[in-house]
Amino acid sequence: PLSAQELLSCDTANKGCRGGYVNNALEYTVMRGLSTEECLPYKGTFDAKCSEMCVDSMKVRPDSFCVLFGDNDIKREIMKNGPVVSSMEVYTDFLSYKSGVYTKGEDVPKFSGFHTIKIVGWGVEDGSEEEPDKGHKYWIIENSWGEDWGLNGYAKVSEGQNLFFEQYAYSILTRKQSEEMKQSYERKQKAASDAQKPNDVPDMN
């Protein structure tokens, strides 16, 4: 595992346990790389010193990261490469979540702030065998509040609630993935350009 503590202690663009931004953490990871959990174990405190030994040691460094827009992009990325990271709006009723599929209360509970989570999968509850997709669709997220919270640290969150994280999820890319994405983009640009070219007009002479 990679060191979450390094992001808390060494990423000066964020504020450790007092909060920060996902893109700042990802930029640090791309620019500096991350040490292993063994080198810099998780202490869960912002006061833990940034270990120079680990900062200078061998790092795992991705090539880049990208933003995923919408349900299909998120699901496609999870299927192909694994979990993605995002931030979600948190309301007071989410703090006491225990089980089931979380849906924000109708009485509009108090907004508590934004919180970074990991999206690890999705599912459907109460769907029939004939129409399995007609049930209650949800995301499976991994939280950072310990195993005593929710479903051993995880939660099922209803799809389409506009809790922000479906709009701005992030994926980390290896060099190969970056090249594949670049080539795919260039192919699409060329196809779009070719489609806009006027058809050849035959010479009438």
Model-derived features: positions:
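Catalytic-core signature of thiol
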Residues: P1-N205
